[in-house]
Amino acid sequence: MKRIITLTVVNRSGVLNRITGLFTKRHYNIESITVGHTETAGVSRITFVVHVEGENDVEQLTKQLNKQIDVLKVTDITNQSIVQRELALIKVVSAPSTRTEINGIIEPFRASVVDVSRDSIVVQVTGESNKIEALIELLKPYGIKEIARTGTTAFARGTQQKASSNKTISIV
């Protein structure tokens, strides 16, 4: 089962390595990781999209993550109302004669062309993973040279009451 787990951590060298080591040790496949600064100086947010077997595995993983010294908060936001986004850059084979056609394909996705060369264009698209996958499928017939994706980043929408199913543990 796919889970979205967010962590706030002290921004220090080696923190990400120790955290990913826990996933490796327990044989969990990490689909994506995003890391960035937060509104608080010296604190970063990490968003993991990870595959686990069941609820017990999620609880065990959450407990193990919270034992890490530099981890401030761990939240499994999978079942919450969340805002999630991913960015993809897609380099597509494009002769000048096909550019208008490709622009017609990317427009409904609110994607944009961010680079043009003689034989290719680079398309930028943001949104949920399924939206990005759909655009990639439509662009495949033209020939995709490269794809770079950021991975999912997410957090809970607005102010939410904590449901009993939310797995939020904070150690500060």
Curated annotation (Swiss-Prot):
Keywords: Amino-acid biosynthesis, Branched-chain amino acid biosynthesis, Transferase. GO terms for molecular function: acetolactate synthase activity; acetolactate synthase regulator activity. The keyword Transferase applies. Pfam families: ACT_AHAS_ss, ALS_ss_C. Transmembrane segments: none annotated. Gene3D superfamilies: 3.30.70.260, ACT-like. Chain A, domain 2 (3.30.70.1150). The keyword Mitochondrion does not apply. Its EC number is 2.2.1.6. One of its GO terms (biological process) is L-valine biosynthetic process. InterPro entries: Acetalactate_synth_ssu, Acetolactate_synth/TF_NikR_C, Acetolactate_synth_ssu_C, ACT-like_dom_sf, ACT_dom, AHAS_ACT, AHAS_small-like_ACT. Belongs to the acetolactate synthase small subunit family. This is Acetolactate synthase small subunit. It comes from Bacillus subtilis (strain 168).
